[in-house]
Amino acid sequence: MSNPYQNSQNGYQQNNSYELNNYPNKQYSSSNEDDFVQFMNEIQDINSQLDNYSNIINLIDNKQKNFLHGLDLNDEDTDYDSKQIENLVNEAQSLQLDLKNRIKNVQTQAVHSRDQTKVDQAETCRKRFLDLIQDYRLVEARNKESTKEQAARQYQIIKPDATDEEIKAVVEDGSQQYFQQALMQSNRRGEARSVLNEVQVRHRELLKLEKTMAELTQLFHDMEELVIEQDQPIQQIEEQVGTAQHDIEQGVGHTNKAVKSAKSARKKKLWCFFICLLIVIILAVILGAYFGTRK
């Protein structure tokens, strides 16, 4: 029996490298440059995780197909294969949560930094994650439909005259009533029980697939909503900039008024000085003429 994670690292090998020199050459101060390098390192790590996530999706797809198409309850490896798939699905769920949080963090950093390069890289990660979530949903949807078809065919082996309503109740709802009726009406109860057990196993697998699809749908919605959430800080920054600009303009206006007032006050002082000087001169002339005539 092989180890389900044997050579798993080979499955997760990186097919792409994300080099920092692929980004625009911009001038940064020493502290900003360190911040930019840290940000791009985080982007690189996220892309590596996205590679891993893609590989896990492919593994889940292949193993689900093999398990559901070749289901044999008499095979001692059946439980092992089912557990292997369950482990991969759990690993994908854990990775999804980590990716969601990390992508949200880099988008928040990018928005607050107002660095378009950071914004573009964070958005690229988000869109790539959305594409992979959609791929995973399609994988589960295909396997779900395939499982339903196989379960329906198996049920019709022991009850060829089963109606569509009955098949749906057995395959999708796991109706025990129809199971018991089919067993009672079958001439080969041993074979019928074996087939019905397989149908029940496929029904349980259907429930797992539907649960995963529901979780992926919610995750896809959350990642789409992330863009709307990130718009709010941008609007706040723009409003703050607008307010600051308005305050500056008001300050300049007040300053201009103060300058004009100061100039006006100086002019008034000069006029007062000249008027006083003129009065003194006139008085001096009058007094000089008066005392001159008396002599």
Swiss-Prot record:
A Pfam entry, by short name: Syntaxin
Chain ranges on the Cytoplasmic side, renumbered to this chain: 1-270
SMART domains per UniProt: t_SNARE
Main location: membrane
Residue ranges annotated for the t-SNARE coiled-coil homology domain, each copy included: 196-258
Membrane-side (Extracellular) residue stretches: 292-295
Residue ranges with Low complexity bias: 1-18
Superkingdom of this protein's organism: Eukaryota
Biological process, per Gene Ontology: exocytosis; hyphal growth; intracellular protein transport; protein secretion; vesicle docking; vesicle fusion
Gene Ontology cellular component list: endomembrane system; extracellular vesicle; plasma membrane; SNARE complex
TM spans (from-to): 271-291
Keyword Transport: yes
Ranges of Polar residues composition bias in the record: 19-31
InterPro entries membership: SNARE, Syntaxin, Syntaxin/epimorphin_CS, Syntaxin_N, T_SNARE_dom
Keyword flag Transferase: no
Sorted UniProt keywords: Coiled coil, Membrane, Protein transport, Transmembrane, Transmembrane helix, Transport, Virulence
Record membrane topology: Single-pass type IV membrane protein
Localization, UniProt: Membrane
Coiled-coil boundaries: 33-110
PROSITE patterns, sorted: SYNTAXIN (PS00914), T_SNARE (PS50192)
Known function: Late secretory t-SNARE protein required for secretion and proper cytokinesis. Plays an important role in the secretion of virulence-associated extracellular enzymes and vesicle-mediated polarized hyphal growth.
Protein name in the entry: Protein transport protein SSO2
Native species: Candida albicans (strain SC5314 / ATCC MYA-2876) (Yeast)
